[in-house]
Amino acid sequence: GYGGKGMRIAILDTGILVTHPNFAALPDDKLDDPITRQSVDDIWYTLNAGKSTPKLNRSYYNTKLPFIFNYATADFDVSNTYAGSDHGTHVAGIAAANKIEGSKAVGVAPDAQLVVMQVFQSGGGAGWATILAAMEDCVRLEVDTVNLSLGAAAGFTDVPTMMETMNKFLESDIQIIIAAGNDTNNAYGNRWGMNMSLLPNPDTGLVGTPSTYSARSEDT
């Protein structure tokens, strides 16, 4: 099978519990062209992370987590104590949790490196300026895959800065994995003021509100 050896997976989320045993350092035989402390040092001041803080680079944690940075606070603390959620730990674990003895929990690509980019602010919510700064650094760090389980509303944009960043991704070989969207404004043909699609115009583009009944869509 495929264990993820040589892959770099960026997780833009609430940060992670870096001391979790499933994120322990990878042994040398699991590494192939890895991100190293030196490779990040070499480009540190070209990264948005490096430009946002006067502190010396402390983004390297171990061979499993070669880059950790909190883009919301411009520091190196990516613990859940700031964002108040372990969502990022969960997502990172699904993607690349190490296989450890005595545990059945293992990621899809356990031999991959994780690039941890905390973008959520205290109390929840992530600003697009913060997200875009992290995404631009993904390109410079030459990651293979970016996961964005952000829960933002679905839709389209023509904001120049956002379009520019997205175009950089299109020009690269990076695979972007984005949540389908938790909600949106279904303005076309919906019930006035209720944001619910009519039967002849069903919502098929979202996996959350309003296509699925939940606490966020009490009215069906």
What are these regions (language model features)?
Residues 1-128, 141-144, 170-173, 186-188, ...:
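Subtilisin-like serine protease catalytic core
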Residues 81, 151-220:
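Substrate-binding/specificity loop regions of serine endopeptidase catalytic domains
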Residues 126-129, 157-159:
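Short, solvent-exposed loop/turn segments at secondary-structure boundaries
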Residues 133-142:
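Short, well-structured alpha-helical segments in soluble
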